[in-house]
Amino acid sequence: MSINHFNNNKNNNNKNNKNNEENFWDNTQCNNDRNKFSIDNIINSNYPTANTTTITSTTNQTIQNNVLNSINIKNNESLKNIYYDENLQRKLTSINFLKNLCSVRDQPFNFNEHIKSIQSINSYRKCISNEIFKKNLINNQLSDILIIIEITSFIGDCIFEIFYLNYFQETLEKDILLFSNASETICIPSHHSPSPQFPVYYTENINNATPSTVVSNSPNNYSQPISPQSSQSTTPTIISSNSPLKTRNKNNNNNYNNNNNNNNNNNNNNNNNNNNSNNNNNNNNYFNNNKKNKIGDCNSNNSNNNNNNNHNNNNNNNNYNYNNNNNNNNNNNNNNNNNNNNNNNNNNNNNNNNNNNNNSNNNKNNNNINNNNNNNNNNNNNINNNNNNNSINNIINNNNNFNNNNINNNLFNNNSMNYNKKENYNWESSSSEEDNNNLIKEQSVKKNETVKKQYIPRKSKYVNYERIKKVSLSKSVEPFDTMKRMEKKKPGNCSMCNIKESISWIKTMVNGQLCNACGLKAIRQIKIEN
């Protein structure tokens, strides 16, 4: 689009000039052809400057009032009423100007057109800088304020499009070197440049300005919320509901074990760091003193701990409520733990480690235990958390834990690629022994069921049938549906998966070639090793 525009102007204005092709992109020609997109034209189309004769006293007074009012109002106002709504067309014009410049990005590769595009980019950079230099020479103070607003907003619209052009130019030079011998148009995949960061537009409250989403009219039609982070955003990993890495949290309160992908907070020495989704920077700890896990049943302990060692381990596997208070280094020696128990007693413990029982007993031990029962026994209902995090009783059933070494995040072992022949997997953690027994019964019943046999052709010493079965089951590919027979020929290399000796020449209805490893149809021009 932009190249055609420049070429049309070139042909209309310089028909008899033989050196148009060489001199078209110099500064002189650029200054002659840039009037439509110049900042002069853009600003004058919205606000008359001090040098124009068409300005009226009414318009000048209105502009003065708007500027002075915006300057005098310091809070809860912005400069939006001066330029944003009125100059929306100017913004669109500036974006379209750059859009036309770099529209060649979405076109097939063409050597000559890309060279012209790079030259036009460099020329228009000079044009923009010259216009900005001119506007800085204006002496009228009121016009200076308006022009600064106009130019600043114009640059805000253009500079990140130029960011695209910089990236595009770098990749373009590589393409030119790569396809320098090409004389015709070649279609190549388009380059995906990183999304730029746009400047924050003024909001109604300039003091509470928040990032907004700016939609650009560039060819890529990107839309990105403004953030101070890097322009190259990282895509979060999405784990599907059928993934073996996703375990359903049956306990409560979203307590995850980041080490073993299970819901137990008792198998690691670093439980106080990794087992809870609670933020350690929060000094408000909530304790469940009753057997019901409700918000209304929680009592807040507002003790200030500099070490943030207070963690809530709420595990409801067996309806046990654990209150683990590890106050290692408390600034306050008087830790007032207000427990709404049956005795309703307030105890002032001068020890750094407090044992809060329902009987309100003060035990000088190194363990903080909040027992809902009236016993200090270390039974299955209690957890002893030492200050050194050395001894932790494993109370939750080991059936809730998955061994990551057996799962390996895949159905196959990375070394031997042995297919796990279990027909069904229960990736959810069972919360009781009864669930495990039911699972064993279901699996035993399914093993006795008759399974429909898959058609397998006559055996060949060049075909690894176990590997074919494994891959076809994992990728839901059935490579033998259209097969009639197989010929014994020496295998070659697959062009899809690049695995040596994985191609066996197979005659199908379309006489194609089928890879035994990936189950895909390879390119027909593949060479067979002798």
Swiss-Prot record:
One of its GO terms (molecular function) is zinc ion binding. Residues 1-27, 212-386 are annotated as: Disordered. It comes from the Eukaryota. One of its GO terms (biological process) is regulation of DNA-templated transcription. The keyword Zinc applies. A zinc finger (GATA-type) spans 494-518. Residues 7-17, 216-290, 299-386 have a biased composition (Low complexity). Keywords: Metal-binding, Zinc, Zinc-finger. This is GATA zinc finger domain-containing protein 4. It comes from Dictyostelium discoideum.
